[in-house]
Amino acid sequence: MSNLLQTGAEFEKKLKERAESTEKMLNNEFRRLGESVSEAVTSNETKIRDAIALFTASTEESLEKHREGVKEAMMQHRRDVLKLAGNTGMMLLGIVFLLFTASGGTLWYLGGRIQANLEEIRKQEETLQKLNAKTWGVEFVQDGNRKFLVLPYGKSAEVIPFQGKEWVHLKE
């Protein structure tokens, strides 16, 4: 029996060695598998992180371009609005200037005409005074087919034949 015990002890020893060897091998394999999985996860994590960073950078760049485009469009719109307002203002100023110029020209022309008319009236009054002085205030009036000589107040007339014509002599 001792042989059997010895064989059993050897078998148990071999089984124990084999179990330890299998355990070591499995531990090594699990460790390598863990390292491989960890490496793969780290690699994927890096790839995902890089992809996210690239997407974020691309999105930020696109967003910045969009912002600049919108900003430029707004500035262009602002310039267009200011240009339109400036053109409208200049057109209004031009119209006001033309109205003032036309009004001033009209007033200047009418002022000249009034001045000329006043000068003409003054000349006519002088001529009338000269005529009144020469005619001693006698006026000629025509009423239809009849003609009259009107004497000034305080004067009387006497008809005198002279040189083949009838003359009117004024008396006071």
From Swiss-Prot:
Signal peptide location: none
Top-level taxonomic group: Bacteria
InterPro entries to which the protein is assigned, alphabetical: MbeB-like (IPR006922)
Keywords: Conjugation, Mobility protein, Plasmid
Pfam families per UniProt: MbeB_N
Protein function: This protein is essential to promote the specific transfer of the plasmid in the presence of conjugative plasmids.
Homology family: To E.coli MbaB and MbkB.
Subunit comment: Interacts with MbeA and MbeC to form the relaxosome.
Name the record gives this protein: Mobilization protein MbeB
Protein source organism: Escherichia coli
Source species taxonomy: Bacteria, Pseudomonadati, Pseudomonadota, Gammaproteobacteria, Enterobacterales
Gene of this entry: mbeB
